[in-house]
Amino acid sequence: MSRVSRARSAGFVALLGAGLLVSSLEAQGYRLRLDARAQAVAYRGVRADSVLFADVVVGPTGGYQTADGFFVHCQSGARHCSFYRPGPYLQGGPLVTSADLTLWGLGINGLSVRVNARAGADLGDSDVWPGTEPPIQLMEAYADYASRRVTGRLGRQLLVSRLGIIGFDGGRAIIRSQQLGLEADGYLGYGLARATALPVSSSAINPLDEFQPRSRQLLAGGGLGWAGRYGQARLEYQREVDRDSRQFGSERVALSGELRPFTRWTVTGGVEYDLANTWFGNADVSLRYTTAAVTALVGARQYRPHFDLWTIWGAFSPVPYHAVNASVWVRPVARLELRGRGERYAYSPTETSTPLVDVDDDGWRLGVGASFSPNAVWTLDAGYREEYGPGASSDGFEASISAVPLAQLTLTAYGATLDRPLEFRFEEAGVDVLGLDAEWRPSDRLRLTLGGAHYREDRRRPDVSGIDWSQTRLNAGATLFLGSGADRSRLPRALRTRPPAGTR
């Protein structure tokens, strides 16, 4: 696909949104958001190379390397050894355009329609930017009917729950009882791949190869929630079924809740259970205390990655890690905030042995920072973070200065450092970042952004493979908000979905 055709594809969503806007002028109300973002970046690539095993030499550290100093990887019994050389500079130019349209006042009280789509293209010569295929993606497109007791939704939609974010094409229904504070919902449809708006059978997900399902999975689930004066709770169930094999792709249940026993105190928590693998997934509990001067939080959590049963990753039996953490925000004066956070974690036993090496199974992370606003124009922020874990560690500083010289203009300068020594690699990479951003709002309907950043990377290696991956990125964006006269008029009274305080 040529750059011209890719640019045309990227503009398709904007034209589609404009066309839908014109066709909806007879409706009582609409709201349209058009957003375009572009970036230009150049960075060093790499190319694979090989050398005969007979031509390698032993380097000063005892490993094999080429005659000109590149470390190589030699498999037992192989005639050739592989390594990477610096490649040509690659030019990337991602352009993303999105349109988000909502229509209402369609002749039925409570009926609305929403369409959210995006187009992406790589205008660079190398065509290497990920996420630009397919060029057109439909994120959401559904009709929604809402009343005081019932809500129904039909079409492509994103479901956000304790079990994660997943998209599907189908229907969802919600029933409420204000007197009891209860809400029940159920949904059914054809699921999308996780973290994408594409079917799991799409050719764009071809790295799955022979493990890729040939048909879209069937997604079904539901939930029951309660909300009252002192808290809320929700129970959820979700399953995915492979339509070809008739086998479960996943089956999980989750329970989450929030308790407000006293003023300023909040307890939140949740747990997930994988019925297919018969183990507990993510779980967490936290206690928060909030005042005007201090906010403090302590908590504990378990993290275990979730993989669908049809993938190969579940065969590795991922073990969870358990962590305890604490955070605090202190505001001694009105314009100053101090913050700090720390966490300690440890992995469960993996039931494997490493007789030739000792491997850590625990780690910690911490961060401190401060934000200061001497007046309404300037805001200064700085922080330090450090982390040490199995196989790697990192530490670095970050700082930013923001200025609002005009109500419509915001300027930001920022910088950061990151050092990342790796236990099982040769290099100890370091990255320094300097950048500038500007945002101009000439009206309440238009927002323009412009920025640039330089990333300087130092890959400290004992051989000549310390490839310079420094790069400069430039970005620009525009966001346009459009709406009908009904959109600018006074909003109707909100639909209450929770019982009034004190009714329970």
Region annotations inferred by a language model:
Residues 2-14:
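Bacterial N-terminal signal peptides that target proteins for export
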